Amino acid sequence: FPATEYFSNNAHRCYFFTATPKHSRTTEKAGMNHTRTYGNVICQVPAPTLVRAGHILPPKVEVYKSRILKKDELVADRDCEQMIGAIDNIRKDKVLICAKSTKQIVSLISRTEFVSELAHRGYSWMMITSKTGAMIDGEKVTREEFFDTLNKWGRDYSKRFVVLHHSILSEGINVNGLEAV
């Protein structure tokens, strides 16, 4: 926030674009409602309007019911079973999995057979969170390399991959060629 405030105060013109504006009730925390830094809202378009105009695609939600954990079963094992089952059912080459926490992603890839099950099906995988950084097929990479690879794989019709991301609706991520979320 201090960097944004600095550039905003020292620029002749400054514009901010976001699909998910963040607001704060206090001036100590960053919030796009702080007009001294961000200015007034010039234009705000609701997502349904953008969908109707054909500018963005509507979300297609496919619901899978979660079963109750078995005695002594780890949540990550159940998540693995459900995610692999969903990938098998939707039969798409490019899949985005949205997790509720970084811990959930880390548990899924480190404590279960998820990664080996993906490999068995011909999928690569990638993840990025603010806590862990970026990773592609188990190798730590820079953010730049992550997004370059994401775009490259997204344009490659033959590439099968899964992106694991935390809080996708609040952060946002753009995946070329994405077929299923």
Language-model segments: residues:
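Conserved helicase motor "Helicase C" RecA-like lobe of SF1/SF2 P-loop NTPases
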Residues: 102-129
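Short glycine-/polar-rich loops that comprise or flank the Walker A/P-loop
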Residues: 10-13, 38-40, 56-60, 121-124, ...
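Conserved interdomain linker/interface between the two RecA-like ATPase lobes of SF2 helicase motors
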Residues: 39-106, 111
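SF2 helicase motor core recognition
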Residues: 54, 162-181
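Post-DEXD/H (motif II) to motif III coupling segment of the RecA-like Helicase ATP-binding lobe
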Residues: 2-56
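Conserved helicase ATPase core of P-loop NTP-dependent helicases/translocases
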Residues: 122-170
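Switch/connector loops and helix/strand junctions flanking conserved nucleotide-binding motifs
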Residues: 23-28, 135-136, 173-174
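Short hydrophobic segments within beta-strands
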Residues: 17, 96-98, 128
